[in-house]
Amino acid sequence: MEDPQPLPQSELPLCDSLIIWLQTFKTASPCQDVKQLTNGVTMAQVLHQIDVAWFSESWLSRIKDDVGDNWRIKASNLKKVLHGITSYYHEFLGQQISEELIPDLNQITECADPVELGRLLQLILGCAVNCEKKQEHIKNIMTLEESVQHVVMTAIQELMSKEIVISPASDTVGELEQQLKRALEELQEAIAEKEELKQRCQELDMQVTTLQDEKNSLVSENEMMNEKLDQLDGSFDDPNTMVAKKYFHVQLQLEQLQEENYRLEAAKDDYRVHCEELEKQLIEFQHRNDELTSLAEETRALKDEIDVLRATSDKANKLESTVEVYRQKLQDLNDLRKQVKSLQETNMMYMHNTVSLEEELKKANAARAQLETYKRQVQDLHTKLSSESKRADTLAFEMKRLEEKHETLLKEKERLIEQRDTLKETNEELRCSKAQQDHLNQADASATKSYENLAAEIMPVEYREVFIRLQHENKMLRLQQEGTENERIEQLQEQLEQKHRKMNELETEQRLSKERIGELQQQIEDLQKSLQEQGSKSEGESSSKLKQKLEAHMEKLTEVHEELQKKQELIEDLQPDISQNAQKISELEAALQKKDEDMKAMEERYKMYLEKARNVIKTLDPKLNPASAEIMLLRKQLAEKERRIEILESECKVAKLRDYEEKLIVSAWYNKSLAFQKLGMESRLVSGASACKDSVAAAPARSFLAQQRHITNTRRNLSVKVPAAASD
């Protein structure tokens, strides 16, 4: 192998940068350097990711993975990749690759030439830029480094400048190609028929030679028999001798052989006539073949002329486009000169304005710093105010709770005073009853009879004591019940206090959230004003999009307001579920914070996308846009024509196969019939000979005249049987 030539400096970074671009496709096989790409496996996987429909898995399975150092497998893989790329350009994109862009695969496989590999990778880049997923691939290119982006863009421009789009004159070329295809098909048919006729002539010549050999052998046998007849003429006078019998038998055989000879000569004449007809047909086919070859040469010449005219028309179109571009540039130059003069005048005005604006800017920066300090102080004061308001609310709630406790204590004090008074009255009554009972017990036993009425009167006093005791027990039970009820009431009051506390906290949080919403609205209004001021300076499209974003954010804020109002109504309606409402309010605040963060993130993303779009618009030339709608229609028509041509070719192939099968069947039938005729003739000859022998052996006592009559009858029967077999 020859040593590779030194590479130009412009070709080396192309291969390296395209390898970096290939690494963006996550392939199974490595693609770090030139040697890893020489097998063609990674390039095939990249093409499969670019267009799955065209470079399908069946196509990918043709490319062998286990290559090793076998350069033949590498070359076959690279040929398959290059063939797939050219067919994709020609059939799917409707473009022709110029010969300058086609790489030398032998240099890639043998020498690992990065220049030729760079050309092949450049064609893959063209497939990626012109496919259906081209926007994704362009975004991937924009994520690369600036130097790599520059090299990739130059490679794309090189491809665009050297691509040849198929012109509308391709219809006439298609018709000529169809005529050429038809002529070639007829030529192939004529050649096939010629070969068949040659084979048939050879077969007939072989048959003629065999028949001539048989004839010569029969003639020689005839001569031998004649000689024997001459020798045995004397012995034929006596019919009873064995020689006479043999003579008659040989004479019969001779007559049969003569008849067969006549029949073979007739068949020979037929074959000769048929052979002459076939030779005439062969001459006609040769003339037709010559005419078709001349037509094919004319079509090739016309095709070459069409290619030349197409190249000249492309050059003329390019020159016309360049002339129009130069005219537009001249007109733009005159306009630019006028604009330069006006801009120089306005530049002086702007210089004075900038000096004055810089002074104002210094003052504004100082004022802005003061404003920021004031804003921070205001925020600190707001936080302090919110904390103090919360503290005041809690203190007011505790004050209310203490007042309620004071009122309950006063009520309990009054109740205890009433209980004390009742207990004093009961105590006095018990003392009186006890004194009466002691006085009655100290009386004499003799006075019992006289004081029976008094004892009867004292009995109700005991009952009265029992009644008083029962009243006391009843009061004590009531006091116990009231104590249990008071404990329960205290528990309920504690629960109520907790709920009231939560209510106050929720009200304070609601008030603070309202203040926060007001602050957010003020901030949004300030942002709208600043955006309006910036919109007058920036472009119209970006400002309109930012306004749409702001309107969307405003709609979101209104939705949040509506949700807050609904939540307030729910708080007012469902006071016992204050804890759940507090959780919902905290969730809403978290959602608000998330929405604010999402809004900020969306604005930052939007700015990034705008900058990327501007960079892409600056880098890409607007003249290199995809083809117009008319070219797309022409491509569709060409695809439909190609489909029709494929269908017609398949039908033509099927018809040829059917004709060939019919011819084979006819020839086989003809050969089979000849074989059966030969077998029938041989069987009849054998049966006739055996019949003659039997007749001779069975009738030894016949006379000479009877024998002659019998021979003539057998001859007639044989002559009748032989033509019948021929007709069969």
Swiss-Prot record:
Region annotated Disordered, chain positions: 481-510
Gene coding for it: Hook1
Stated name of the protein: Protein Hook homolog 1
Family: Belongs to the hook family.
GO MF term set: actin binding; microtubule binding; protein homodimerization activity
Keyword Acetylation included in the entry's annotation: yes
Positions in coiled-coil regions: 168-443, 477-658
CDD domains in the record: HkD_Hook1
GO cellular component: cytoplasm; FHF complex; HOPS complex; microtubule; microtubule cytoskeleton
Region (Sufficient for interaction with AKTIP and VPS18) location: 657-728
Domain of life: Eukaryota
Tissue: Mainly expressed in testis.
Annotated function: Component of the FTS/Hook/FHIP complex (FHF complex). The FHF complex may function to promote vesicle trafficking and/or fusion via the homotypic vesicular protein sorting complex (the HOPS complex). FHF complex promotes the distribution of AP-4 complex to the perinuclear area of the cell. Required for spermatid differentiation. Probably involved in the positioning of the microtubules of the manchette and the flagellum in relation to the membrane skeleton.
Illness: Defects in Hook1 are the cause of the azh (abnormal spermatozoon head shape) mutant phenotype, which induces spermatozoa with highly abnormal head morphology that differs drastically from the compact and hook-shaped head of the normal sperm, leading to a strong decrease of fertility.
N-acetylmethionine PTM sites in chain numbering: M1
Region: Sufficient for interaction with microtubules, residue numbers: 1-555
